[in-house]
């Protein structure tokens, strides 16, 4: 006789907004449309977004990812190369021009806005203070918009305390778009305390999607026995969500790329799980994780939503006459 084993009850607090932002959506669409328009291969400099699932999905369609332009073989120089959503230093398109490469720039428009803010500070004679994480592609790209020696990178309040600029009365700051809103506010406050004449950018540099995802996690995390963020270990905004969940009161918070990474033996007795996804994490993985919990629990999904995002960024002019179908994006959005 078969005896049915009841599953333990579980509430999943599903955060909204979550996952792809308009800049990530646009960048992926650019690669997909370039493949439809020009055929494979399409080269992409650096990961188009920081997510292996997305990268592997595009590779399956015919994209080839490289770190430098000199990796593109001579016989493929006529094929397009796409610059990633994180932005690139000015030297990269200059190098592409010197090699007679046709390139499509998938830099997020909000990152491009930070570039313009930094260049405006520089044009007006201010030394630029960039708040961001050393080595991140976006930071490398922003610093690469300016002449060497005209920008200083600050990561923490402690960095501010030891910062000694040549002209403390002539500084302007910008920030990486994917930082912790609260941490960045602390760094800016200390900068303003030390340098009262510090000039702010004309608009907030941290992007709407970063802010929205952090705000809903703050609301959903209290009372969660476990909070799961879908994202890659090299995704800045995803890692910030893990930190935000812990600070907001989640007992435990973890970053996973796939459901297979969840350590079920380590979960313990849980009643409430929070679930969000970084701006470069596809919805198909969120659904995969929900199904993994439903296999083990009698799970009820509750939507924790703050705002509905309606932002949409146009793709490059060269690609706007190419039809983008639901099937083209099913590998990340689901059917």
UniProtKB/Swiss-Prot annotation:
Cofactor stoichiometry and binding remark: Binds 1 [4Fe-4S] cluster per subunit.
Binding residues annotated for isopentenyl diphosphate, in chain numbering: 50, 86, 136, 235-237, 280
Keyword line: 4Fe-4S, Iron, Iron-sulfur, Isoprene biosynthesis, Metal-binding, Oxidoreductase
Gene Ontology molecular function, alphabetical: 4 iron, 4 sulfur cluster binding; 4-hydroxy-3-methylbut-2-enyl diphosphate reductase activity; metal ion binding
Binding site residues for [4Fe-4S] cluster: 21, 108, 207
Pfam families: LYTB (PF02401)
Active site, UniProt feature: 138 (proton donor)
CDD domains linked: lytB_ispH (cd13944)
Gene3D superfamilies per record: 3.40.50.11270, 4-hydroxy-3-methylbut-2-enyl diphosphate reductase, catalytic domain (3.40.1010.20)
Statement: the UniProt record of this protein carries the keyword Electron transport: no
PANTHER family: 4-HYDROXY-3-METHYLBUT-2-ENYL DIPHOSPHATE REDUCTASE
Family: Belongs to the IspH family.
This protein's name: 4-hydroxy-3-methylbut-2-enyl diphosphate reductase
Species, as recorded: Rhizobium rhizogenes (strain K84 / ATCC BAA-868)
């Amino acid at each position: 006789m078969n005896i049915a084993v009841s599953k333990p009850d579980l509430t999943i607090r599903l955060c909204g907004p979550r996952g792809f932002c308009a800049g990530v959506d646009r960048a992926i669409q650019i690669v997909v449309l370039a493949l439809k328009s020009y055929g494979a291969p399409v080269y992409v400099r650096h990961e188009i977004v920081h997510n292996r699932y997305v990268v592997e999905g595009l590779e399956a369609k015919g994209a080839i990812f490289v770190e430098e332009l000199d990796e593109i073989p001579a016989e493929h120089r006529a094929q397009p190369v796409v610059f990633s959503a994180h932005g690139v230093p000015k030297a990269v398109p200059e190098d592409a021009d010197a090699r007679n490469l046709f390139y499509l720039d998938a830099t997020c428009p909000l990152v491009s806005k930070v570039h313009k803010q930094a260049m405006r500070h520089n044009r007006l004679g201010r030394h630029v203070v960039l708040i961001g994480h050393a080595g991140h592609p976006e930071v490398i790209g922003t610093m690469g918009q300016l002449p060497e020696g005209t920008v200083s990178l600050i990561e923490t309040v402690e960095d501010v305390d030891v910062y000694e600029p040549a002209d403390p009365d002539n500084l302007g700051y910008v920030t990486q778009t994917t930082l912790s809103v609260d941490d960045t506010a602390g760094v800016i406050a200390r900068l303003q305390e030390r340098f009262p004449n510090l000039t702010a950018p004309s608009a907030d540099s941290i992007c709407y999607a970063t802010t929205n995802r952090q705000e809903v996690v703050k609301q959903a995390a209290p009372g969660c026995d476990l909070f799961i963020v879908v994202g890659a270990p090299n995704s800045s905004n995803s890692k910030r969500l893990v930190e935000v969940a812990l600070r907001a009161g989640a007992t435990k918070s973890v970053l996973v790329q796939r459901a297979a990474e969840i350590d079920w033996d380590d979960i313990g007795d849980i009643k409430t799980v929070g679930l969000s996804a970084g701006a470069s994490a596809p919805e198909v993985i969120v659904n995969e994780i929900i199904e993994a919990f439903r296999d083990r629990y009698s799970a009820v999904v509750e939507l924790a939503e703050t705002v509905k995002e309606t932002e949409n960024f146009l793709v490059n002019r060269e690609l706007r006459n190419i039809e983008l179908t639901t099937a083209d994006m099913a590998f990340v959005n689901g059917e």
